[in-house]
């Protein structure tokens, strides 16, 4: 069935499903409109008049007249008014007015489609074990990551358009902080953080040098280690800046969800969900993984509990389970955000003075209209973690089995095919075969340059970095909302 075969059929079927079925059955829409989320409606001006004890006024002498029309003063009411907001379940009609709803729906539904394609491809590879096919599910995962980063970039740019500049300063500050943090992490020896980045880069550099030598080119390598780490740190600083406000918002929703939760099991799950990025970070700390998990000290001797391959598999499964937990707790966090409308009204009642009815209505309505922005800030990091883990499993040559039958060897053989390996076919009909052979040899050379060692080190670091950024920003947000703001 060609170069891609069955995988191409799966991709075409999924594209058809996205076009025909998802507009009618959408997970993104169901997460918001399943009846569990309730939003607060802003009161009408007539209701506010009745609560304030004011009657509908006609034209009075106090009204100022400009150019033939009457300009009424804005209606104001006391801030300590006895106002109780009415709630309503989120419906599909309500979502039409939400900011960023199309982006939210596209990201979630495309992620679901990409995950299904990945699962089908994994089943296909486990049974058929093809060796000459391109794994097209990797393209889907890369597209998901690109869409998630694009959405986070779009949300971050809005903070730079605000005239006050407070949010812009926060993004820039955290960006520089994460750049310094990334440079510090990249110079730490692998005795503490076992990404395998040093080994992977060394293997990549040696393979690239050997490939260039076989092409008759003299080179000391494609890029120096310092340059590689510098550009990687710049990329990490951008990721950290994009994840700044999602982490800060998560901290506020976590505190509100804890106050809203009444059952102990819900509170426990909320705590685990908040600490999930920390658990992911600790999975790559070598003193913990090597000394206490893989080789726990039992008496005077340390007994090997599992192999490195088994621990790598357990690490993948744990990250996926924590991602599933975060998705399951999404409803609690979004409802905690929607409750901010009533919380703002309660806070207003404690203040003295008056407020215009228009400002009050905007204050209440603004919470619901930005629901999808908050949902994107919650979902996008989750999507990045999940599909970065899937890429790590496939490109890093890991296994899903806890006890694999045989270890998956990492190809480190640098014997690359030479230029003269192309067979010469003098007949004109053989030109197509020559082209196919050249493409095959080129792909084989690329596989020998970009080895699983490189992908394992790079993707392990990026997965760890996303979790570290989330935990750092959410921890700062927890401290800020708990101690630096007035409740």
Swiss-Prot record:
Record localization: Cell membrane
InterPro entries named in the record: Transmembrane_161A/B (IPR019395)
A Gene Ontology BP annotation from the UniProt entry: regulation of heart rate
Main location: membrane
List of glycosylated residues: 34, 135, 203
Disruption outcome: Knockout mice are perinatal lethal and isolated embryonic cardiomyocytes exhibit arrhythmic calcium oscillations.
Regions annotated as coiled coil: none
Membrane topology: Multi-pass membrane protein
GO cellular component: plasma membrane
Organism domain of life: Eukaryota
Pfam family for this entry, one: Tmemb_161AB
Annotated TM spans: 107-127, 136-156, 169-189, 228-248, 265-285, 305-325, 367-387, 459-479
Keywords attached to this entry: Cell membrane, Glycoprotein, Membrane, Transmembrane, Transmembrane helix
Function: Essential for maintaining normal cardiac rhythm in the developing heart and for neonatal survival. Inhibits potassium and calcium currents in the cardiomyocytes, this assists in timely action potential repolarization and thereby maintains normal cardiac rhythm.
Protein name listed in UniProt: Transmembrane protein 161B
């Amino acid at each position: 069935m060609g170069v891609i075969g069955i995988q191409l059929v799966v991709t075409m079927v999924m594209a058809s499903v996205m076009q025909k079925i998802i507009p009618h059955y959408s997970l993104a829409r169901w997460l918001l409109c399943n009846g569990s989320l309730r939003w607060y409606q802003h009161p009408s001006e007539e209701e506010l008049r009745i609560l304030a004890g004011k009657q509908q006024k006609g034209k009075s002498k106090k009204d100022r007249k400009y150019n033939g029309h009457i300009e009424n003063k804005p209606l104001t009411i006391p801030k300590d008014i006895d106002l109780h907001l009415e709630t309503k379940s989120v419906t599909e009609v309500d979502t039409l007015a939400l900011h960023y709803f199309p982006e939210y729906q596209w990201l979630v539904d495309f992620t679901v489609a990409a995950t299904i394609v990945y699962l089908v491809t994994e089943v296909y590879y486990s049974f058929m074990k093809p060796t000459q096919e391109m794994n097209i599910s990797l393209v889907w995962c890369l597209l998901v990551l690109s869409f998630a980063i694009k959405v986070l970039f779009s949300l971050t740019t809005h903070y730079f358009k605000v005239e006050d500049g407070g949010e812009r300063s926060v993004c820039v500050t955290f960006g520089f902080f994460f750049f310094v943090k990334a440079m510090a992490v990249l110079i730490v020896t692998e005795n503490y953080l076992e990404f395998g980045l040093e080994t992977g880069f060394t293997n990549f550099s040696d393979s690239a040098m050997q490939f260039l030598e076989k092409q008759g080119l003299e080179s000391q390598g494609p890029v120096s280690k310092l340059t590689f780490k510098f550009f990687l740190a710049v990329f990490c600083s951008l990721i950290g800046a994009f994840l700044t406000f999602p982490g800060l918002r998560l901290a506020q929703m976590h505190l509100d969800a804890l106050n809203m939760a009444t059952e102990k099991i819900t509170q426990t799950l909320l705590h685990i969900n908040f600490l999930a990025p920390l658990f992911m970070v600790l999975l790559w700390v070598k003193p913990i993984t090597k000394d206490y998990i893989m080789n726990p000290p039992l008496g005077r001797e340390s007994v090997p509990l599992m192999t490195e391959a088994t621990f790598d598999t357990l690490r993948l499964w744990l990250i996926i389970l924590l991602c599933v937990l975060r998705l399951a707790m999404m409803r609690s966090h979004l409802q905690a955000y929607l409750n901010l409308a009533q919380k703002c009204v309660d806070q207003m009642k404690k203040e003295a003075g008056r407020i215009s009815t228009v400002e009050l209505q905007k204050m209440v309505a603004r919470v619901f209209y930005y629901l999808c922005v908050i949902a994107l800030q919650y979902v996008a990091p989750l999507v990045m973690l999940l599909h970065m883990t899937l890429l790590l499993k496939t490109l890093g040559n890991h296994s899903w089995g806890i006890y694999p039958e045989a270890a998956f060897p990492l190809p480190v053989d640098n014997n690359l095919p030479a230029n003269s390996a192309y067979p010469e076919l003098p007949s004109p009909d053989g030109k197509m075969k020559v082209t196919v052979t050249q493409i095959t040899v080129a792909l084989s050379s690329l596989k020998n340059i970009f080895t699983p060692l490189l992908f394992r080190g790079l993707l392990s670091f990026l997965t760890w970095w996303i979790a570290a950024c989330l935990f750092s920003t959410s921890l700062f947000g927890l401290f800020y909302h708990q101690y630096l703001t007035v409740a």
